[in-house]
Regions:
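Inter-Walker segment of RecA-like/P-loop motor cores
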Residues: 89-120
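Conserved helicase ATPase motor motifs in RecA-like P-loop NTPase domains
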Residues: 164-178
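Charged, low-complexity
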Residues: 1-38, 111-113, 118-119, 133
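Inter-lobe coupling linker of SF2 helicases/translocases
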Residues: 110, 114-131, 148-165, 188-249
Length: 249
């Protein structure tokens, strides 16, 4: 497989040893060239940041370097640090003071990955409307409410990724309360994947009792990859916690 060979070479110099499920997830994102986006939805603690880092590394090596990471503000510095320490990729954090210079048409944007917060993306949406090679959205469950039409941040991110070659959403909880949340996430990067909200509801929400659950699972599996902790415990040593009851004396 061409992508497997390329990744092996790319990761030779990386300061990280990806686990098999992380490589699988990265390959899933890279081997879907006709999809505008994917969701990497591994459970908490399985290294979705590493998976995205591998994808970014591949794009970087191909000199497709117009890359944007949208993340909670508290994680911006961590992303910058991990990209450089683990993958030797430089990144810079966008803020209101630097945005005009960094996003100016003549600026050599390809010298570093750009990182911004969700708040920044919402406030400065117009400045971020461009032909990105890759957009990564971390903690993307923040975008699940896109289906309601009331999520301003989700709407802004959807507009931003509209011009991207590929979008990668990272979230451990793609679904929490309503099936429509799945529709909301996928529609961030592909508004027509489920045709329309009405069509989705008719087929999958109302039709769940008619046995359409398998069909929905198949449709979602085409755009989403999820590994559970129990599937990864053979090569990740999780801390085992045992509750102990101690009597007060």
């Amino acid at each position: 497989n061409d992508h497997v060979g390329k990744l092996a070479g790319l990761l030779f110099d990386a300061q990280v040893e990806p686990k098999p499920h992380q490589i699988d997830a990265a390959l899933f994102a890279l081997q879907t060239p006709f999809l505008p986006g994917v969701i990497l939805a591994d459970e908490v603690g399985l290294g979705k940041t590493i998976e995205a880092g591998i994808v970014i590394t591949q794009y970087w090596a191909e000199r497709k370097r117009n890359i944007l990471i949208v993340t909670p503000s508290s994680l911006r510095q961590q992303w910058k640090q991990e990209l450089y320490e683990k993958f030797l990729i430089p990144a810079i954090i966008l803020d209101p003071k630097s945005k005009d210079a960094l996003l100016a048409p003549g600026h050599g944007r390809q010298s570093e990955v750009l990182i911004c917060s969700y708040e920044f993306a919402q406030r400065h949406e117009q400045s971020l409307l461009r032909g990105w090679d890759l957009v990564v959205a971390d903690e993307a469950h923040r975008l699940r409410n896109h289906w309601t039409g009331k999520g301003k941040t989700a709407e802004a991110v959807s507009h931003i990724v509209g011009g991207a070659h590929k979008t990668v959403l990272l979230t451990a909880t793609p679904l929490q309360n309503k099936l429509e949340e799945l529709y909301g996430l996928v529609s961030v990067f592909d508004p027509s994947y489920f045709y329309s909200l009405d069509a989705f509801r008719e087929r999958y929400v109302k039709g769940l009792d008619l046995g359409n659950g398998d069909d929905l699972a198949e449709r979602v599996a085409s755009v989403a990859k999820r590994t559970l902790r129990r599937d990864a415990d053979k090569y990740i040593h999780f801390t085992k916690r045992m509750p102990l009851t101690v009597e007060f004396t």
